[in-house]
Amino acid sequence: MGVNTAGDPQKSQPKINKGGIGKDESFGALFKPVYKGKKLADPVPTIEDKWQLLPAFLKVKGLVKQHLDSYNYFVDVDLKKIVQANEKVTSDVEPWFYLKYLDIRVGAPVRTDADAIQASISPHECRLRDLTYGANIYVDIEYTRGKQVVRRRNVPIGRMPVMLRSNKCVLSGKNEMEMAALNECPLDPGGYFIVKGTEKVILVQEQLSKNRIIVEAEPKKGLWQASVTSSTHERKSKTYVITKNGKLYLKHNSVADDIPIVVVLKAMGLQSDQEIFELVAGAEASYQDLFAPSIEECAKLNIYTAQQALEYIGARVKVNRRAGANRLPPHEEALEVLAAVVLAHINVFNLEFRPKAVYIGIMARRVLMAMVDPLQVDDRDYVGNKRLELAGQLLALLFEDLFKKFNSDLKLNIDKVLKKPHRTQEFDAYNQLTVHSDHITQGMVRALSTGNWSLKRFKMERAGVTHVLSRLSYISALGMMTRITSQFEKTRKVSGPRSLQASQFGMLCTSDTPEGEACGLVKNLALMTHITTDEEEEPIIKLAYAFGIEDIHVISGRELHSHGTYLVYLNGAILGISRYPSLFVASFRKLRRSGKISPFIGIFINTHQRAVFISTDGGRICRPLIIVQNGLPKVESKHIRLLKEGKWGFEDFLKQGLVEYVDVNEENDSLISVYERDITPDTTHLEIEPFTILGAVAGLIPYPHHNQSPRNTYQCAMGKQAIGAIAYNQLQRIDTLLYLMVYPQQPMVKTKTIELIGYDKLPAGQNATVAIMSYSGYDIEDALVLNKSSIDRGFGRCQVFHKHSVIVRKYPNGTHDRIGDPQRDPETGEVVWKHGVVEDDGLAGVGCRVQPGQIYVNKQTPTNALDNSITLGHTQTVESGYKATPMTYKAPEPGYIDKVMLTTTDSDQTLIKVLMRQTRRPELGDKFSSRHGQKGVCGVIVQQEDMPFNDQGICPDIIMNPHGFPSRMTVGKMIELLSGKVGVLRGTLEYGTCFGGTKVEDASRILVEHGYNYSGKDMLTSGITGETLEAYIFMGPIYYQKLKHMVMDKMHARARGPRAVLTRQPTEGRSRDGGLRLGEMERDCLIAYGASQLLLERLMISSDACDVDVCGQCGLLGYKGWCNSCQSTREVVKMTIPYAAKLLFQELLSMNIVPRLALEDEFKY
C-alpha cells in the first residue's frame, strides 16, 4: 500500500470510469452513489465517533428524564385538562349561583412555617426537617356573590408534592456551583419526591395497552376471545367478543347476559343480514362457515329490526341508578349503554353508530381469524402490547379523583349555607374554598407516603406504587429510578411473563432482574430508552385524511375486506382504509423525520391483520436509531465533529432526519444492523451502540459478554449493595442508615456506561491485587484470604452512620417534654457513668465516644402528659412531675457522635436528630464481591510476612481460590485481571465495555513488552517457607466491592434472656435478644435419630417447662391439687408439660373444645 505509484506509468491506475466506458465523466457520476462507502479506501464512520451520540442523548432524555418529562407534562398540561373537564360548580338550591375555574397552575416550592422570612425552601432542608417538599396549587375563579360576578386570582386550593429536578423544582436549571450552595449533589438523579422527610419514588408501572384489540385463545378448551380495555376520562371498562359453542357473543360488565354479536350489530343499525355477513366474514369461505351459526342464532331469537334488538338488550342491562329515579324504557337504556359504556373510547355523535359497529365487526373478525390461523393470536407478553405508566399519569389519576371529591364537598357545603333562609352577611363562596384546601394536600401526601392508590371512580386499588429510594450506594439509587414493576401476582409460578422476550432487545436490560419470586417481573430500562408522553391526536387525523384515507362511514363491508385494502388505526380507533399502505407509511415517516410532526409518533404496517397502526399515546418504550438510506448511514463524521465541538445537540440530529425514535412495533417493520459492516441494501436502521441493550446497573460489569448469563444477573443485585459514596452531599445528610467507604477508587477497567452515568465520580469499591491460588484451608467455598497489612493501610474500611431522632413534644394540656441536666452522684458530685457523654444542655457532645448503655439525649416527659384536665398556668416546677424517657445507645460496639441537629417540624414541635458513626475494618465473615457475581466472605486474615510475593516484592491483597472459576465460567473476570494489569503498567484506564473493550491479544502483547508473562502469570515465592512456588500464579488487579452484609450487624447468640409474656418461650430476633429456635424440621431430625432425651431437654426443659396439676379422672387441668370439674382432690397429680401446650389446652377450652389428658403411670412395674 505504501509504495509511491505516481512516477511509474505501468503501476499507475488506468483512468477508466467505474462504468468502464471511456472518458465520459457525467456517465460515471451515475454509478458513484452505488460505490460510495463500499471501497476499502473510504473511511467507514468508526465506532469511536458514533458513541458520542450517547452522552448527547442522555443530556436530553433517558435514565431519569422520563420521570421528569412525565411530571412536567402533568403539571403543565394535564392539570389544566382535568380542571377544564370539571370547571363548574353549581348549586341545587339557588339557580343563580355558579363557581367556575378559569385557570390552574402550580407555584414554586414554599415553606409552611408560620414565621418564615424567606419563602423558598430547598429539598435538603425538607430532608433534614422531615417536611414535605411541595408547592401551592393556585386557581383563578369566577363566581357570583349576590348580584355581582366576582373574579379572584391565585386562590390556593392545596399543595402538590414537587418532584426533584422537575421544572417546578428549585434545582431545575442550576449549575454545579448553585447546587453546592443548596447542599445538593449535581450527580443525584432527581425524579423522586420528598414526603415527610423520606425520599419516595413512584416506580414505573407496566400494564397492557388500553384501547387495543387483544386476541387470546385456548384451543384445547375451545376458547377464543378478543378483548378491549376502553379507557377515557369518564370511565374505564372491558369489552369482550367471545365464542360459545361456535357462536360469537359480546360480553360486558354492564350487561347481564352475553349478547349474540349479530343482535348487537342490528341494534347499532346494521339491519340487513347481508351487510353484517360482509362486514364480519367478507368473501373468504372459511370465515363464512364459522360465522353462519351466529347469524342463524339471531333469526332463532326472532330479532329482525334494530328496535327488537334494542329491546332484547335493554331487558338485560344492569342499571345502577338511585332507587328514586324512574327507569327509562328498555330500548333507550340499551341505546345509552351501547353509546356510552360499551367500547367507550369510540365516540358516538347523534346516535351515529357506524364506527362502533365496524369496530365490533372487526373484533368478531379477529376472533374468526384466530380460529382459522393460530398466528393471529396476540402475545400478552410482547412489549409492543405493553404500556408503562409513569409518575405523571398516576398523579393525574389521583389528582382528578381528589379534585372531583373537593368539588362535590364544596357543593354540599355551599348548598348547606344557601338553605338557611335568614342569612345575616352576604354569602361568599371564596371562604368555602379555603376551608377544604386540606383535602387535596392530605390525599396527595397519603398516597405518596403509603403507596396505596385507591380511586373510587375507576375502582382502582393498587398497593406498592411508591417505594423509599434506596440510598445504599449511588448505583442503588440510580437503579431504582429505572426499575419497572408489573402488577402481576408474584406467587404464581408462570414462566411466560418472566421469560426474556425477543421484543425486549434494546428496550429493557437483559441482565438486571432480581432472583427469587420477582424474577422476570421486575425489569429495568436499558440505557437509551425513552418513554413517550401523550401527543395531540387532531393534527394526525387531519394529516391521515390528507394522505388519502377513505372515511370509515362510507365504506361497505365488501370494500373493507377487498384485496389490497389496509385498515388504518389511530391509537386503537379505526380512521378508515388505505389502498396504498406503503406509500402512506413512507410519507408519514418523511414528515416525522423532517420534524413536522412529533418524533415520538409511531407508525407501522401489520401484514397479518392487513392494517396500518399509528400510535401517539403515552407509555410506549422507544429508542433512537441512526437512519440508513441506500446502504449508507446518514450520520457521517462531519456531523459527529459538530457534536464534539458543541455546535450540535441531540435535537439537531432528530431535526435533520439523521436519527429517529423507533418504538417496539416499528422495530418489527425495520431491518436494524448492529455494526456498519453488516449493512445490506435492505437495512433501514443502524444501532448507535450495541452495549446500550444493557441498563445502567449491568453496564458496570467489564466484559459481560464473556460471562455466563446468570453471573451478570447476580452482579446486578450485588452492585446495588456495594458500599461506596452516595453523593457529594453525603456528609451533610442525616439518613436512617448511611454507608461510606473510606478510600473508594475508580475501577482500573472501566466501561463506557461507567463514564456516562458518573460512576467513576462516586465509585463503590477498590482495586485489589488478587492472586488466584489455593492457600491454607480457609479459602474453601469462595472464602477469601485477606492481607492484614492491606487492611491496616485502609483496604475495605468503611464508616456506618445511624440516625436516631426524638421529638420534644408539647401536650394538649399545656405541659411539654424537657431536656434535663446530666445526673450527678450525690456524694462525689461527679456525673454518673450512664450520663457520661451528656453535656450541660442535656445532649451529647459532638465527637464523644458512646459506650453501649449510655444516654445521649436526656429527655424527660411529664407524668401527667396524657390527662386532659387543663393545668392552671405552668405550675409544673415540681421535680417529681417528670419521668425519664432518655435515648440510650443500644448497639453492641461503641460509636462516636457525628452530628446533633435541633430544628422544628412543621407542627412546631422541636425535633432532635443524632447521627452516630462507627468506623469498621474488614473482619472474618464480612462479604466481598468482584464485579462478576463472585461473592465470598473473608475466611482468614493473614500477616503480610506469610503471604506469597513476587520478585518485585509485590504481595497480593486478596488470595482467591481457583475452584471458583470452572463451574461459574466467569471468563470476564480473568480478562479484567489481564486488562487491569496492562492499565497499571501503561498508566491508563482500560475499557472493558460490552461487545468491545481491550482485546486479550493486545493486552498480552503489552504485558510482554513490559517484561511480564503474556498470560498474566507470575512466579511467586512462599512467604512461609521462602521457597519458590511450584506453579506460576495468575496475579493482577481486580475491582472488589465491599457489600453491606457485615458480621457485626448479624452476629447473635444467647444463653438465657428475655421471654415472651404469653407463651413464656424465649423471644424471637436479634434486636430483642431472642433465642435460636429449634424448628419443626430440626425436631423431625432428632426424632429420626431417636434422641428422645435431647428432644425433651430442648423443647421443654430449656424452653418453657411448666408444672401443672392434672386430674386423672376427667383429664382436665386442676389448680393447687384441686380439680374443679370433679370437685375433689382424689386423683390430681403433678406433671411437667411445655407452657405453650398448657396455653393451647386452655385456649381450646375457651372455644368449647374439651381436650382431656389420658394419664398413664410412667413406671408400671
Swiss-Prot record:
PROSITE patterns: RNA_POL_BETA (PS01166). Its EC number is 2.7.7.6. The keyword Transferase applies. It is an enzyme of class 2 (transferase). One of its GO terms (molecular function) is ribonucleoside binding. Residues 1-21 are annotated as: Disordered. It catalyses: RNA(n) + a ribonucleoside 5'-triphosphate = RNA(n+1) + diphosphate. GO terms for biological process: termination of RNA polymerase III transcription. A zinc finger (C4-type) spans 1111-1126. Coiled coil: none annotated. Keywords: DNA-directed RNA polymerase, Metal-binding, Nucleotidyltransferase, Nucleus, Transcription, Transferase, Zinc, Zinc-finger. Belongs to the RNA polymerase beta chain family. Component of the RNA polymerase III (Pol III) complex consisting of 17 subunits. NCBIfam families: PRK09606.1. DNA-dependent RNA polymerase catalyzes the transcription of DNA into RNA using the four ribonucleoside triphosphates as substrates. Second largest core component of RNA polymerase III which synthesizes small RNAs, such as 5S rRNA and tRNAs. Proposed to contribute to the polymerase catalytic activity and forms the polymerase active center together with the largest subunit. Pol III is composed of mobile elements and RPC2 is part of the core element with the central large cleft and probably a clamp element that moves to open and close the cleft. This is DNA-directed RNA polymerase III subunit RPC2.
